[in-house]
């Protein structure tokens, strides 16, 4: 499987394509590079891979389907690589300022609606993904984490998130 790399048009930094085991994005360097976590904006899936794995898991309607497909392929002994060069570009200013896992500066109801929306990080879908690839314990912990951080007041979240993000 080959994932196409996308760069930011002004800075020429990689912003999408694939990342390594530590979740660092992999930049174009003229060679195919191993990918752990596939980002699926531009992907070439050979017929033999599709014949073995099939379509994306239907449970994933927006988020995590690409990552799941790449991990499933690797679990079945296949490889995922980056393209050798950037094949697309975008303007970072067009990217959403809202994180999938928590929307700031809104009330709890709107925050939870976003979390459970197709553009959020639906905890049940994320639980399914985490259980499939990281086990039940990780899935349970992350499920509760998503709800906990969405209950935090913005002032607390802003302090805590600076430490992590």
Language model segments and positions:
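Short beta-strand-to-loop element that shapes/binds the nucleotide-sugar donor at the catalytic cleft/hinge
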Residues: 2-16
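A recurrent flexible, glycine/aromatic-enriched loop bordering the glycosyltransferase active site
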Residues: 24-45, 113-114
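Short secondary-structure capping/turn micro-motifs that flank functional sites
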Residues: 66, 89-90, 147
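A short, conserved alpha-helix in the catalytic core of glycosyltransferases
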Residues: 43-54, 59-86
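Short, hinge-like loop/turn segments at secondary-structure boundaries
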Residues: 18-22, 98-101
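Non-catalytic, C-terminal membrane-associated alpha-helical segments of glycosyltransferases
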Residues: 100-165
């Amino acid at each position: 499987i080959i994932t196409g790399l996308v760069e930011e048009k002004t800075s020429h930094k990689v912003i999408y394509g694939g990342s390594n085991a530590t979740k660092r994005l992999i930049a174009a360097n003229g060679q195919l590079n191993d990918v752990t976590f596939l980002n699926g904006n531009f992907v070439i899936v050979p017929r033999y891979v599709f014949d073995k794995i099939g379509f994306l898991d239907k449970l994933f309607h927006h988020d995590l389907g690409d990552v799941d497909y790449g991990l499933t392929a690797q679990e079945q002994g296949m490889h995922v690589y980056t393209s050798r060069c950037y094949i697309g570009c975008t303007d970072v200013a067009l990217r959403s300022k809202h994180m999938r896992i928590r929307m700031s500066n809104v009330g709890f109801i709107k925050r939870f609606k976003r979390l459970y929306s197709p553009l959020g990080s639906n905890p049940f879908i994320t639980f399914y993904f985490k259980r499939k690839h990281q086990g039940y314990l990780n899935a349970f912990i992350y499920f509760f984490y998503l709800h906990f951080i969405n209950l935090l007041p913005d002032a607390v979240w802003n302090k805590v998130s600076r430490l992590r993000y």
